[in-house]
């Protein structure tokens, strides 16, 4: 016996990139990605580099890693600009971090690994897997530091965009796609 929670689940799948360990950087397929213009129509000035690159700053590192923030900067990060850091190339994906910590059993080191995973997924938007010129809001982005860093009016604009994307725009699209396939 099968239980069907929602019929639209048959017409979409959550795709997780091969470079990810966790699903936060995934996207539905098929899905209607958003252009820069569509994002900005919600009142959110789209800063592509800031919103699609992991949001790593001194205050983020201090809050996440506490007394180990300096160690994280030295071992795993390069300076990107005056405000931000970026992951070193050898740890710039969750899979690379996973491989680096593959033989580690120490709880403190696993905590560090999990923090690095979280840094990598701290983005507001993910690029579409097939068309990198369009974007999807990152699922649950409101729980991350990039969202916290936004002004209140930008948070409100992102929330409108997010709710429309996940609860209207794509539901209608999936319904229309389902109607083409169902008798």
Feature roles, as predicted:
Residues 1-183:
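Catalytic cores of glycan-processing enzymes that make or break glycosidic bonds
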């Amino acid at each position: 016996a099968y239980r069907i929670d929602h019929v639209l689940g048959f017409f979409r799948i959550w795709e997780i990139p091969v470079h990810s360990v966790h699903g936060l950087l995934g996207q539905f397929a098929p899905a209607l990605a958003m252009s820069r213009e569509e994002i900005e129509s919600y009142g959110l000035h789209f800063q592509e580099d800031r919103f699609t690159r992991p949001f790593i700053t001194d205050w983020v590192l201090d809050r996440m890693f506490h007394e180990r923030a300096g160690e994280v900067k030295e071992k795993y990060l390069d300076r990107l600009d005056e405000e931000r850091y970026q992951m070193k190339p050898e740890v710039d994906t969750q899979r690379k971090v996973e491989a680096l910590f593959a033989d580690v059993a120490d709880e403190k080191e696993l905590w560090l690994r999990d923090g690095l995973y979280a840094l990598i997924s701290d983005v507001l938007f993910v690029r579409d897997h097939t068309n990198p010129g369009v974007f999807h809001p990152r699922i649950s982005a409101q729980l991350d530091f990039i969202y916290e860093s936004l002004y209140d009016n930008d948070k409100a604009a992102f929330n409108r965009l997010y709710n429309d994307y996940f609860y209207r725009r794509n539901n209608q699209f999936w319904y229309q796609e389902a109607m083409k396939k169902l008798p």
